[in-house]
């Protein structure tokens, strides 16, 4: 007996949110984000326990782009939900995440090996865009009426400046996902949300009542830094693993992927066109 398409999709969401299926690889080339050396690093990566992923040590910044990413690195305050964890390690092994349960969830206070924030930068519409991305092993994000969260979740902030030169650039604006499927755009951010005109204070929080979602917003409370690694500083294996990772839940997929990166910049762009 052939199941209706909508029922197959519903079952798939239940399995991927709560069961053993944790990721699939993109097979549609129109939806894929190829690794730096196409065809060379597409072997399935190993999934390892969330607490065993070794973060990248923060490398020395060499280029202006890398220096700017360090200068504008936000401080993240965790009001509720999981703390950020490393998503991938140097050999391309990926975090297995944490199973979502509507009730009686285990705590996720951060990895014993340390945390990580990822970054990718480029020019977009005449502005220098610096994306920062944090990986959560699970998060509140309703996918069906019965499942209000899932394994794997990415939060991101885009910092908009006028130049990749950290010595002369100016913070113009910032964008980040809210809890209502919207994007907060601060143009410009108020001074109470910024330390020394460079460092944004960002809050990570959950909304259980109206929107059933995890999001970010600016705050006047300074949080913590995480070790930063930029897209180009990662190993080929790590970039390939992140680039080919795919889940049915949109927020579970790394915003650093080629296609997603520019999609996010387009939606997050805060200036008049």
Curated annotation (Swiss-Prot):
Motif interval(s): Conserved heptapeptide motif: 149-155
Gene induction: Highly expressed at multiple time points in both early and late stages almost the entire host infection process.
Main location: secreted
GO cellular component assignments: extracellular region
Cysteine pairs bridged by disulfides in the record: none
Pfam families, per the entry: NPP1 (PF05630)
Signal peptide range in chain numbering: 1-21
Motif (Conserved undecapeptide motif): 129-139
InterPro entries hit by this protein: NPP1
Annotated glycosylation sites: 91
UniProt entry keywords in alphabetical sequence: Glycoprotein, Secreted, Signal, Virulence
Compartment(s): Secreted
Known function: Secreted effector that acts as a pathogen-associated molecular pattern (PAMP) recognized by the plant immune system. Seems not to induce necrosis in Nicotiana benthamiana leaves but significantly improves disease resistance of Arabidopsis thaliana to Hyaloperonospora arabidopsidis and causes an inhibition of plant growth which is typically associated with enhanced immunity when over-expressed in Arabidopsis.
Domain notes: The structure of NLP effectors is remarkably conserved with a high level of conservation of a central region containing the conserved undecapeptide motif AIMYAWYFPKD and heptapeptide motif GHRHDWE.
Protein family (similarity comment): Belongs to the Necrosis inducing protein (NPP1) family.
Name the record gives this protein: NLP effector protein 10
Upper classification of the organism: Eukaryota, Sar, Stramenopiles, Oomycota, Peronosporales
């Amino acid at each position: 007996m052939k199941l209706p398409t909508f029922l197959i999709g519903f079952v798939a969401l239940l399995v991927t949110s709560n069961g053993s299926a944790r990721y699939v690889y993109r097979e549609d080339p129109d939806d894929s984000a190829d690794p730096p050396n196409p065809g060379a690093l597409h072997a399935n990566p190993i999934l390892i326990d969330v607490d065993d992923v070794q973060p990248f040590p923060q490398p020395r910044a060499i280029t202006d782009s890398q220096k700017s990413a360090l200068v504008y690195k936000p401080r993240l305050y965790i009001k509720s939900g999981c703390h950020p964890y490393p998503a991938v390690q140097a050999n391309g092994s990926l975090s297995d995440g944490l199973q979502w349960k509507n009730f009686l969830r285990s705590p996720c206070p951060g990895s014993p090996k340390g945390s990580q924030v990822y970054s990718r930068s480029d020019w977009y519409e005449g502005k220098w865009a610096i994306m920062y991305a944090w990986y959560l092993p699970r998060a509140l994000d309703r996918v069906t009426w019965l499942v209000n969260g899932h394994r794997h979740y990415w939060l991101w902030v885009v910092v908009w400046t006028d130049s990749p030169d950290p010595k002369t650039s100016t913070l113009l604006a910032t964008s980040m996902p809210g809890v209502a499927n919207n994007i907060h755009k601060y143009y410009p951010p108020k001074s109470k949300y910024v330390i020394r005109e460079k460092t944004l204070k960002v809050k990570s929080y959950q909304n259980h009542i109206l929107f059933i979602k995890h999001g970010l917003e600016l705050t006047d409370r300074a949080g913590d830094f995480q070790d930063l690694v930029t897209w180009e500083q990662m190993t080929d294996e790590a970039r390939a693993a992140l680039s080919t990772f795919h889940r049915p839940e949109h927020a579970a997929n790394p915003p650093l992927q080629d296609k997603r990166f520019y999609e996010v910049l387009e939606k997050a762009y805060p200036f008049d066109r």
